[in-house]
Curated annotation (Swiss-Prot):
It comes from Prochlorococcus marinus (strain MIT 9301). PANTHER family: RIBOSOMAL PROTEIN S19P FAMILY MEMBER, SMALL RIBOSOMAL SUBUNIT PROTEIN US19M. This is Small ribosomal subunit protein uS19. GO terms for cellular component: cytoplasm; small ribosomal subunit. One of its GO terms (biological process) is ribosomal small subunit assembly. Signal peptide: none annotated. GO terms for molecular function: rRNA binding; structural constituent of ribosome. Pfam families: Ribosomal_S19 (PF00203). Protein S19 forms a complex with S13 that binds strongly to the 16S ribosomal RNA. The keyword Transmembrane does not apply.
Length: 92
């Protein structure tokens, strides 16, 4: 279930301030954030935001198709290394 329209999208205040400051300064440096639940807004297009996945910050370049999604969707937290193979010649 989505967020109520009358409330508007959630975005961390500190992240919003950093993006707006970079827009006024025409600066496109990487912004580090731990706020995976922040919604991607149109004013973020063209920025690179480093989203924390629990271990490191993963750089995410924001495009038009990402608007309305959350930052955490583009920084996976789990690594899949494949299923364990059976030993060769093992009998059940």
């Amino acid at each position: 279930m989505g967020r109520s329209l009358k409330k508007g999208p959630f975005i961390a205040d500190s992240l919003l301030k950093k993006v707006e400051k970079q827009n006024t300064d025409n600066d496109k440096s990487v912004i580090k954030t731990w706020s995976r639940s922040s919604t991607i807004l149109p004013l973020m297009i063209g920025h690179t935001i480093a989203v924390h996945n629990g271990k490191t910050h993963i750089p995410v370049f924001i495009t038009e198709q990402m608007i309305g999604h959350k930052l955490g969707e583009f920084a996976p937290t789990r690594t899949y290394r494949g299923h364990i193979r059976d030993k060769k010649g093992a009998k059940s």
